[in-house]
Amino acid sequence: MRIYKIVGIVLSAMLLLASCAHSDLEEKKIKIAYANWLEGIAMSHLAKVVLEEHGYEVELQNADLAPIFVSMSGKKSDVFLDAWLPITMKDYMDQYGDSIEFLGEVYGEARVGLVVPQYVTIQSISELEANKDRFSSEIVGIDAGAGIMKTTDKAIAAYGLDGYTLMTSSSSTMLASLKKAMDKGEWIVITGWTPHWMFDQFDLKFLDDPKKVYGDLEEIHAI
């Protein structure tokens, strides 16, 4: 998986450089928006280095997802390299897509969904409600504005997970909770996605999603 991450990061920088070469950005200054997700942080910082080597002045703008799309639609940010489509960020694209241009695909085999340790004996989201006591009736998530959180709200409704609370936190807090639970051999369910190093460090699996709430494979786009 690591080699695909590297290819994606390099490709994002190349796409951005090609776009800038055909644009009329004033004074060659580019504003790159990014959220606090590892792949987005890596792609944005590498793109900054590549663009600066080609004479561009680059400003990195860190924000939550909703403000990023507002900023993109208002032309206060020029580029976002971490748009997960067609499902995860669909609501944002439906709202702001008319004012956003696609630069290209960065990574074509991304996936999002609910993730558990391999030792957890259930295989499907449809089994969660019957096992809510094992999971302390919690799905551990990330920041509230993230696309995966919006989709998980839809999954809770679609699968009748009325006994669960979707816990808002951050990526780092979620991963700390995952490690703590796995060290104790406890059951835990989190909002997860690939590419992400958690699948290299921990023995994890996606729960099957027979209703396809999370869709199939996602694509990461530069916009």
Regions found by a protein language model. Name each.
Residues 37-38, 59-71, 166-177:
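Short helix-initiation/N-cap motifs at beta->coil->alpha
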Residues 26-39, 56-61, 136-140:
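Short, well-ordered beta-strand elements
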Residues 44, 64-97, 176-177, 197-203:
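Pocket-flanking alpha-helical
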Residues 106-113, 198-223:
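Periplasmic-binding protein-like
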Residues 47-55, 130-166:
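Ligand-binding cleft/hinge of the Venus flytrap
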Residues 98-145:
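A conserved helix-loop-strand patch within extracytoplasmic ligand-binding domains
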Residues 15-19:
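C-terminal motif of bacterial Sec signal peptides marking the signal peptidase cleavage site
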Residues 77-81, 151-212:
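Ligand-binding pocket segment of bilobal, Venus flytrap-like solute-binding proteins
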